[in-house]
């Protein structure tokens, strides 16, 4: 991929390893800053990290997380990044309405999903990422669950498994 004249769709469908080196380097610096910030703010840790960071070469994984706040996205994304895994988060397409957010999410390898529909474009992009050996992050509830008493409903994501 070239550095300029790329659309977000080019990044949604391209292997992370083919992203321009400047983009990958920028992502690494931003991840470092976010890792330090999130560790200082929330003092999180990954339990059973060896299970999460263990991977089979050439085979992608679907990482499924509960979504209780926006903070866990930082924790999960940075922990996996510094554990040697390049994760492709699936994000709601409403975020892509902002050009800056759309640009940023596409450069970290995010894949937009049109919620409430059978978004085959998203599923195909995630499927191709998995076939290339990349990892996909999904929050299957489709939204944040504010209370631990409420049992989360699973709206999507299991088509990838």
Each predicted region: which residue ranges?
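A transmembrane-helix-recognition feature enriched in membrane-embedded lipid enzymes
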Residues: 2-50, 99-108
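Soluble catalytic domains of membrane acyltransferases
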Residues: 23, 43-161
């Amino acid at each position: 991929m070239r550095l300029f004249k790329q659309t977000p769709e080019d990044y949604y469908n391209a292997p992370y390893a083919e992203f321009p080196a400047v983009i990958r380097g920028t992502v690494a610096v931003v991840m470092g800053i976010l890792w330090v910030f999130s560790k200082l703010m929330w003092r999180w840790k990954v339990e059973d990290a060896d299970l999460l960071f263990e991977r089979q070469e050439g085979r992608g994984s679907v990482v499924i997380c509960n979504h209780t706040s926006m903070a866990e996205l930082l924790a999960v994304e940075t922990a996996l990044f510094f554990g040697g895994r390049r994760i492709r988060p699936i994000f709601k397409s409403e975020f892509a309405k902002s050009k800056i957010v759309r640009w940023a999410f596409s450069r970290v390898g995010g894949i937009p999903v049109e919620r409430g529909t059978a978004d085959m474009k998203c599923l195909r992009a995630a499927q191709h990422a998995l076939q290339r050996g990349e990892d996909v992050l999904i929050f299957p509830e489709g939204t944040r669950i504010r209370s631990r008493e409420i049992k989360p409903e699973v709206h999507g994501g299991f088509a990838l498994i």
